[in-house]
Structure formats: structure tokens, C-alpha cells
Amino acid sequence: MMKGKGTEDDRPWQSYHTVYTTAKAGMELVDKEKVQRVVYEMSKGSKYFQNEERKEAFIKQKIDNLRIQCANLTQEDLAHYQKVADRRIVELEASRDLSRIWLHVDMDAFYAAVETLSNPTLKGKPMAVGSMSMLSTANYEARKFGVRAAMPGFIARKLCPELIFVPTDFKKYTYYSDLTRKVFGRYDPNFIAGSLDEAYLDITEVCRERNVKSEEIAQELRAGVYEETGLTCSAGVAPNRLLAKVCSDINKPNGQYVLPNDRMAVMTFVSSLPIRKIGGIGKVTEHILKGVFGINTCEQMLEKSSYICAFFSQSTADFFCSVGLGLGQTDSPQVRFRKSISSERTFSATKDEVLLHKKLEELAEMLSADMQKEGLSGRTLTLKLKTASFEVRTRAVTLQKYISSSEDILKHAKKLLQAELPISVRLIGLRVSQFNGDKCSAKSDPTQKTITNFITSGDVNRNCSSFPDVADHDFVSNAETDMSIDSRQTGQLDWRDPFDGNYLSDVDYQSCTVQKSDGVEEVSLSPLVLPYITGFRN
């Protein structure tokens, strides 16, 4: 008998979704099923794989519960929430600001490009920065095979046997990052550095003063970066930061895309834009929006606005509706304050206390250097540990005095670590918050009691960079890098996708930045849903 089309039973990898199978720039023609199969087969049976299975089962349960609640909504309920949604959409529309011009610049495969610049023999060959344990990034030649950042090197080698590995060199990347920032400063002295390899610039004034179009500034800036560094970058121009970020990815590498400051142009642009393209919507939120509400594009956020208002808190519903309208942050960051600063390191799992204390000392020194560079001192110190079984634990202490020296940070961090020993961990992180002079640092941000009480019952604040609104409403927070998880939550599952080894993505590894990789996605839920959603712990 002829065998029929494969099902999930004989092709289990088809239902296995990880960050490694999500396309990045340069991966448009990748055989996605092959990548899924390789990742599935090489991770099957590992602790990471078991963690993934728990995550999938958890989200499936939540999706099933939400579907039941959707089915129980009456026509009267929907009519009520539609009125709520319509009123809020009108209010959001009234806030639309088309007066600013934002440019997002993103270096092309930054770490890999820097290494190729240092060693021209790598040009045209598939290469990745990292090791057999974990990759930081991959060049565009390697991406054609499905190799990407955050992927274990041994999986990458399986996908691309010719792959060349180059060890990381952050001093080198920081040097070139500083060169790019000199160029950015010519166009906007108050630019927002999202990470080592990206930035947001308000080019409104420079366009007005020089009487030039935004595309000319984008072209000139990109040429300036190349002249200064020998590296290429891509740019996106739009009326707000959220859309500028999306636009910078359209013509990668070494290209640019300009979205006019026109309402109709914006609405047309977002009408067919996949929701996953939006900063703040990661894998889990995508699954929920698609699986429960049938929302695949930004435009459908408005079409399903009654359900959004019924099931999500006002801040989350506002974010989703804003996405449907193509709205985002347009204000200048000068008046905003940094709320936290952190450092973390990932390594092969170990219970060696001497090594753990050495890692802690290194983190304290890096954290202190960053704080003193910005003139910061803080009262709350948080320790984050990721165990060998991918469980994320956090412990925090609020001190009587403000601290900033590496000695003070290390002294209190050791006490927090000592309480957890003996333990085998693969990640250590330190975070300092509640800074001196920050009147609101101890208060919760109403937009940040966010996105999933699906995932955790604790209050989780958004990951803060030196400019805390880099990703606009970044409702999807990465538990791997978010040091602000409520210290009472000690059994959170890890929602990123690492194996053993270093996890180093194209982000500033020394400071707390808004990262776009998959993480815990916290969703504030309305009272309608909360009885059916419970936080979980191991």
C-alpha cells in the first residue's frame, strides 16, 4: 500500500518549534523542514529538549483554556467589548504623531563582519562566531544553510559541514561599535543605542535643517559607517521607532527602506505585516494570538479587537491595537531614566564553587564599571542562576545604602549565591536597580505588569536598557536576560533555547538590553481569564 502524506507521528519535528527555525535576514530560501528535522534529531533526549516539551505542553494547555473561554463569550459580551475597543482605538488614533522621522540602523551580521574584516580569507565562506557549544552570530553565507545566532555549534556543523568557527572577541566588537556610534552622533547626539550593533536616531531636525529627504540621510549615514569602519549596515526610516525597526530588516544586508510619514502608507504597510515582525511579539505570544484568536497579521489586531479587549489588560490591549494602527514611540529619550543595569554569563554547567565565585567576581567588575561610567549607584541587587536543568532562579536583596563598587557588589552577591550552594548552574547574572535619584525606580510601571501571567504569577518588569523604551512597548520579556523577575519566583522554566556552552547573541553582553530572541512572554490578563490561568513552578 502506498504511504500517504507524512503526519506528525512519523514527522515529529514538524511540530517542534524553536528559535533556531525562525528565519532571520538571509535565511529566506532555507529548507525550514530540514532545519527543524536536524534540530529535533540532535536535541532529542537532552535536558533542553525536555524543557521544550514542558513549555509546549504548558502553552498548549493555556491555548486550550483560552479557546474554551472564547467559546463561552456571548454576543452581548462581544458587543460590549467591541464598544470598549472602538472607543480605545479612536483614542489611540488621536495620539498618532507623524511629525517625527525615526531611523533604525542595524549592522549586518556584525560580529561575523568584524571578524571577516580582520581576516579577509573568510570572505565568501560560511563562518560563525562562537564555538561548538554556542554561536553568537553567523554570516550570510552560513545563514543560507539555516545556521544562525543562538544555535549550538554542533547543530550548525550538521547543517553546514564546511562551517568555519571563529572565537568571540568582544574588545574588538566594542571598538568597532564605538566607531559606528561616532557616525550616529553626527545625526542625532541623543541616539538610542539598542545594543552594540544597532541604534535608533531621530533625524527630524537634521532633515529639516539641511532640507533633505530622509532617504538621503539614511544613505549618507550608511556610507559614513562604511567609510569609518569598512562594515556595512542596513537602515529603516519610519514615523516611529517600532516601524523603523521593522523597516531596517526589509532590505538587509546593506540596504534601506523608507516608510513615508503618511497615515495611509502606514496602514497599508501594517495591513499584511506578520505579527512576529513586531518587537515585543515572540514565539509564545505569536502562538496564542494565532492559535486562539486567528490573528496572523497586524491588521487583524483591529479586526479581533473585541477579543483582545475581553482577554487582555488595558496596557496589553492598547499595545496590540497600537500595532494594528502602526503606532509606536516617537518621543525623545532625554527625559527617560535608566531603571536597571545588569551583566550575565553563560557557560557549560558546573558545580565548581571556585569557578562560580570567579564568574561572580567578573560580573561584579563589569557591572561596577558600567555603573561608574554612567554615574549610577543602586540599592537593590538581584542574582540570577540558571540550573543544569534549565530552571531559572532569582534572589534579590535591598540594601540600606547605595552601592556601585565591585567590592560592595561582590560582597552581597556572594551572600546570595552562598544560600543556593551546592548547585550546578550554567548561567550567572547580576542586576542592580533602584538607583539613587530615580524617584520612580521602586514603583511599578503600569505598562509593565505584563505579558504572561500565563507564564509566571510574579510581577515581571520589562528588560531595561540604558534607554528603556528601545523596543517601544516590549511586552515580550526575555527571562534569560530579564533580571527583574520577582525574587519570589524561583522555579521559572527557561524560555530561551540554549544547550551547554556560551550563549552570546548580537547584543551588548555587558549591559541589560532589550533583546529580540524568544523568552518568557508575560501577558496581563483581564479578570475574565485569570481564574483559568495559573502561574507554574517546577
Please provide the spans of the model-predicted regions.
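Residues that scaffold, gate, or flank divalent-cation-dependent active/transport sites
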Residues: 1-196, 200, 324, 505, ...
